[in-house]
Amino acid sequence: MVRMSRPLFLDWAWRPLCSPSQSLPLTYGPEGWILQWKGTCRQQTALHCPFDFPQAPLRGRHTLSQVPNKGHEKASAVQLPEKQGTDQSRRGPTSAVTKARTSYPESETFIVYLCSYFWNSSKGVYMSGST
């Protein structure tokens, strides 16, 4: 079991990616904090935080469960299209974040999918501390 002394959620690297053009509606519900994000293609995604955000540090295993509309249940499968007609050899390796910014500069829905991809890749991380 991996133990971390600092809360993972508050220091997360994907937080700067999740900054849409307007402020995010963050409400507190019976299951914890709920982040409701309406994308550009009229699909609403709710991210449930089952802990008392923003209180930290955290104890135990906490996950953000994504509740998208039906038909969009595979948000972790993110594939970035290659830009054609661009010489990539002279600029060196390009990160997935840079590709996402150049391919989808204004797509908030894609940013939500990218955030959920990074979250799903770290589901096995445990956090410890005292609440």
Curated annotation (Swiss-Prot):
Taxonomy, superkingdom: Eukaryota
Disordered: region residues: 60-100
Pfam families noted in UniProt: DUF5583
Naturally occurring in which organism (per UniProt): Homo sapiens (Human)
Protein name: Putative uncharacterized protein LINC02898
Gene: LINC02898
Bias kind Polar residues: ranges: 91-100
